[in-house]
């Protein structure tokens, strides 16, 4: 299978075996509690153009959807394994850009016993106290685990390890595949070893297609799980057909289809026999509601029905 060959070809990230053990323990502990667990993938991958990489082809994604969704899943009682691009949006923290902290926080007094106390006006970081409390509660309960990736190779190895960790949970596991994964890569055997120099003239690169990892995920790594993929398009005339084609090819449960122009306010939940449009009203937007709240609410209901159908 081309997908498995690619995972074997690409070098694993440093600490891959350790992370596989950590994820397996996380899933087993929450599974023993009877808790559902969701893997949320978030952010974009990048592929190196040289073996000693200086240049990369990067799939940009802020990771905001994955981070916001992770928060809603935690609030709904799920354990969340958050596989995210380093330095992309992080649950709770993404609402507060670092530059706002510099003007909002100030020392409240001299440091004592190695501790620094900070204070801020309540309106300087609106919502910060509640976000901090939610994050710390999840950390204390052991229901949140964050694992970083950077390159395509990192992502594929860690995705496989995460899937194998969640596989024993059967239908109680959900995969929420919101990461923007590279479509092209250069095989290791075809990479130049050193930095590509501009003195050589215009650059021509031949890249191979990255096989879709939905196939081994559905068939081999976690065949009993509830699997959700995402489809982003710019043409409304083709988006539903492309979502349905993905369901037919990979045989998973749900595609969340969204158009670039309305990505933060509207999606369509597509299954093999239904289409459900989720839309934020102007009032909901004014109140600060995010579309991920509606997405997760819908998927949680579908996941419940999926579990009941399997038992």
Region spans (language model):
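A cross-family phosphate/adenosyl-ligand binding-site feature
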Residues: 1-311
């Amino acid at each position: 299978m081309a997908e498995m060959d690619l995972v074997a070809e690409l070098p694993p990230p440093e600490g891959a075996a350790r992370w596989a053990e950590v994820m397996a323990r996380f899933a087993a502990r929450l599974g023993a509690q009877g808790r559902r667990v969701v893997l949320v993938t978030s952010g974009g991958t990048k592929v190196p153009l040289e073996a000693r990489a200086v240049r990369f082809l990067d799939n940009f994604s802020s990771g905001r959807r994955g981070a916001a969704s992770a928060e809603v899943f935690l609030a709904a009682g799920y354990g969340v394994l958050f596989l995210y691009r380093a330095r992309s949006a992080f649950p709770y923290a993404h609402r507060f850009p670092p530059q706002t902290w510099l003007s909002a926080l100030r020392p409240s007094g001299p440091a004592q016993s190695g501790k620094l106390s900070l204070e801020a006006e309540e309106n300087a970081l609106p919502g910060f106290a509640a976000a901090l409390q939610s994050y710390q509660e999840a950390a204390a309960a052991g229901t949140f685990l964050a694992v970083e990736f950077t390159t395509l190779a990192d992502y594929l190895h860690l995705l496989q390890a995460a899937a194998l960790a969640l596989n024993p949970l059967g239908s109680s596991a959900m995969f929420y595949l919101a990461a923007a994964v590279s479509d092209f890569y250069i095989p290791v055997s075809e990479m130049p070893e050193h930095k590509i120099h501009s003195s050589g003239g215009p650059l021509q690169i031949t890249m191979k297609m990255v096989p879709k990892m939905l196939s081994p995920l559905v068939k081999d790594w976690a065949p009993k799980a509830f699997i959700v993929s995402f489809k982003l398009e710019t043409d409304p005339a083709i988006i539903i057909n492309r979502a349905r084609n993905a369901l037919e090819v990979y045989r998973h449960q749900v595609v969340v289809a969204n158009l670039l122009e309305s990505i933060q306010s509207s999606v369509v939940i597509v299954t093999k026999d239904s289409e459900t449009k989720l839309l934020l009203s102007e009032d909901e937007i004014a109140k600060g509601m995010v579309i991920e709240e509606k997405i997760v609410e819908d998927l949680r209901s579908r996941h419940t029905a999926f579990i009941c159908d399997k038992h």
